[in-house]
UniProtKB/Swiss-Prot annotation:
CC annotations in GO: cytosolic small ribosomal subunit
Keywords, in A-Z order: Ribonucleoprotein, Ribosomal protein
Superkingdom of this protein's organism: Bacteria
Protein name, as recorded: Small ribosomal subunit protein uS2
Disulfide bonds: none
Family: Belongs to the universal ribosomal protein uS2 family.
Segments for region (Disordered): 232-255
Protein's UniProt keywords contain Ribosomal protein: yes
Organism: Agrobacterium fabrum (strain C58 / ATCC 33970)
MF annotations from Gene Ontology: structural constituent of ribosome
InterPro entries reported in the protein's UniProt record: Ribosomal_uS2 (IPR001865), Ribosomal_uS2_bac/mit/plastid (IPR005706), Ribosomal_uS2_CS (IPR018130), Ribosomal_uS2_flav_dom_sf (IPR023591)
GO biological process: translation
Claim: Transit peptide is one of the keywords in the record: no
């Protein structure tokens, strides 16, 4: 495995270079702006390329040493892509709403996750002695908990790295990461504040094609990290008679 490749052409085709209208900009983004066209800021992709490459390396390195990456993107056009990318790279995600204290009050979140597991257990057991009305109430509770916490139910603790789409919308997540010393990789559009972002990636954070490209690259970098971690253990995973259980699945089985 190796870090995923990408080209300037791919970034252009995905519209990564299109910022917001010039009057909506954050002046702190000035170093990353190439210019403007028809009152739209154009992001300097000559800076995006090395900064994106650096972020991919950080993701791979984090996973290679056994770390966990949390994908965060709750805006409509990012929600599904965030979940799919995190799942296929065996990582974690928040794609519905960031609950205040999700990282800084992990104990309370853990209790809610335990409640989700318990409700799951009740609903999956036959003849549990609950009436139809009670089961309906439990199903609604499970749906609500799953929507909020489904992407982190197997995380087992705060993550080692966070990847964020839209730093304006996910301001609370960034504040919590900063308080806990969790490094942040984030897309910074022309209307964003790049301060407190450890690994900023200048680029459009609204276009679906751009979001898909970022998430695909981050997911592939995480998969590269998994391969490196397995390689470092000296095991030939493919030659094993029994495939290893992924940590997330192991946690679920033991819950």
């Amino acid at each position: 495995m190796a870090l995923p490749d990408f080209s300037m052409r791919q970034l252009l085709e995905a519209g990564v270079h299109f910022g917001h209208q010039t009057h909506r900009w954050n002046p702190k983004m000035k170093p990353y702006i190439f210019g403007d066209r028809n009152n739209i800021h154009i992001i300097d992709l000559a800076q995006t390329v090395p900064m994106l490459s650096r972020a991919l390396q950080v993701v791979s390195d984090t996973v290679a040493r056994g770390g966990r990456v949390l994908f965060v993107g709750t805006k409509r056009q990012a929600s599904e892509i965030i979940a799919d990318s995190a799942k296929r790279s065996a990582q974690y995600y928040v794609n519905s709403r960031w609950l205040g204290g999700m990282m800084t009050n992990w104990k309370t979140i853990s209790n809610s996750i335990q409640r989700l597991r318990k409700v799951d257990e009740i609903l999956n057991s036959e003849g549990s002695g609950y009436s139809k009305k009670e089961r309906l109430t439990l199903e609604r509770e499970r749906e609500k908990l799953e929507k909020a916490l489904g992407g982190i139910r197997d995380m087992g603790g705060v993550p080692d790295l966070m990847f964020i789409i839209d730093t304006n919308k996910e301001k609370i997540a960034i504040e919590e990461a900063k308080r806990l010393g969790i490094p942040v990789v984030a897309i910074i559009d022309s209307n964003c504040d790049p301060d407190h972002i450890d690994y900023p990636i200048p680029g459009n954070d609204d276009a679906s094609r751009a979001i898909s490209l970022y998430c695909d690259l981050i997911a592939r970098a995480a998969i590269d990290g998994i391969a490196r971690q397995q390689g470092a253990s000296g095991r030939d995973i493919g030659a094993s008679e029994e495939a290893p259980i992924e940590p997330a699945l192991e946690d679920e089985a033991g819950a």
